[in-house]
Regions:
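A short, amphipathic beta-strand motif
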Residues: 5-10, 137-144
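Exposed beta-strand face motif in extracellular beta-rich ectodomains
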Residues: 60-64, 193-197
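Compositionally biased low-complexity segments at domain edges in trafficked proteins
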Residues: 93-136, 145-148, 225-260
Length: 351
């Protein structure tokens, strides 16, 4: 049963800024931003929060995040939803969570969006059998969205328990299913602290160390003590930023003409574009704005960036034949009679 819960956030704030923590538990404001709990400034690198939790944590999953409040009341939010505590999986009296701030603008975050996570990078991140001792004192978690086939993440450092900087003794991390991070649990009870370490790339097929991450060594100051578990959520491994490359096509919808179009590309033509892109190996499709631009009812409305609404889509991209059934086809017959002539034009007859 967790009796003490300690949050440590690595972040350098400016004068007048305060960091808050919010989460789906009464101790963290129960999801209400206005009831978020302020953290305490420790030093130029850390903000902390210590909570007494004896008897207050059930077998539940607590999701939490951080935000910065400036002197003028504006807020900057930590990006993502991967910070969580699965209470019944952590058998300890004291839990220390050492987190890294996730800036929205980090390029790595783009690779966790739906197109990459569900399609383009779906097969990446192979499972590795990582060590997980029952008497673990520390758990390390790190994210690495851009890895090639047969690559995983490993940890290596100064202490002999993490390889003693011997690349042949690097320890592979396991990719956690349905989570964005890799993880390894270690017993560091015989290590000297501060602990100096780095993450690296590990070849899961050859079972060997490939390369160190870029940047400075990482340093962990939280030592071992009885009945305490330290979970280090280390942000992103500094690897692979330039490993993913994908060709794509940028095109306005109005230029997509198929045999079913009536002189202008339509939303339904995007399916054909997607099929063609897949066939020739393209990875991305960028469309020019598709918002309604009808303002003057003249050719001047053809400029796709002159939107009159941020929400309304342009009606000219609708496929008329998909709006009517066989009993209503006469309603669009006039347009269908001009279909071939309009499709043969070199430019869109906007008026």
């Amino acid at each position: 049963m967790i009796e003490k819960l300690n949050f440590h956030l690595r972040f350098k704030t400016n004068f007048g800024q305060t960091i808050y923590i919010t989460g789906n538990h009464p101790l963290l404001g129960n999801g209400n931003i206005e009831k978020a709990v302020p953290m305490v400034y420790l030093n130029e690198d850390y903000w902390v929060l210590h909570l007494a939790t004896k008897g207050l944590l059930k077998a539940e999953t607590i999701c939490y995040s951080y935000f910065i409040q400036n002197q003028d009341g504006t807020r900057i939010f930590d990006w993502g939803s991967d910070k969580s505590i699965i209470v019944d999986q952590l058998a300890t009296k004291e839990l220390v969570l050492i987190d890294a701030w996730n800036f929205t603008g980090y390029i790595d975050n783009a690779f966790y969006t739906a197109p990459f996570a569900n399609v383009l990078l779906q097969s990446k991140g192979l499972q590795v059998k990582a060590a997980h001792p029952k008497n673990a004192t520390h758990i390390f978690r790190v994210k690495a969205p851009i890895l090639t086939t047969n690559q995983s993440i490993c940890i290596i450092g100064e202490a002999k328990e993490i390889g003693g900087w011997d690349a042949t003794k690097a320890l592979p991390l396991n990719k956690i299913i349905n989570q964005p991070y890799f993880e390894i649990a270690l017993n560091l009870s015989k290590c000297d602290f501060p602990l100096v370490y780095k993450f690296g790339i590990y070849d899961t097929e050859l079972k060997k160390f490939v390369a160190f991450e870029s940047g400075n060594n990482r340093v962990l100051y939280e030592p071992v003590s009885k009945n305490k578990l330290v979970v280090v959520q280390d942000g992103f491994a500094q690897v692979g930023h330039n490993q993913w490359k994908g060709a794509g096509v940028a095109i306005p919808v109005f230029s997509l003409r198929s045999k079913q179009s009536i002189g202008v590309g339509e939303f339904s033509d995007i399916k054909l574009l997607a099929d063609w892109s897949k066939k020739i190996g393209l990875k991305l499709i960028q469309l020019l704005p598709i918002n309604d631009t009808t303002a003057t009812h003249s050719w001047m409305d053809s400029y796709p960036y002159a939107a009159i609404s941020a929400f309304a889509l342009h009606p000219m991209y609708i496929r008329l034949s998909e709006l009517v059934d066989s009993n209503q086809s006469h309603l669009i017959q006039d347009a269908l009679d001009q279909q071939i002539a309009l499709n043969n034009l070199t430019v869109v007859d906007y008026e």
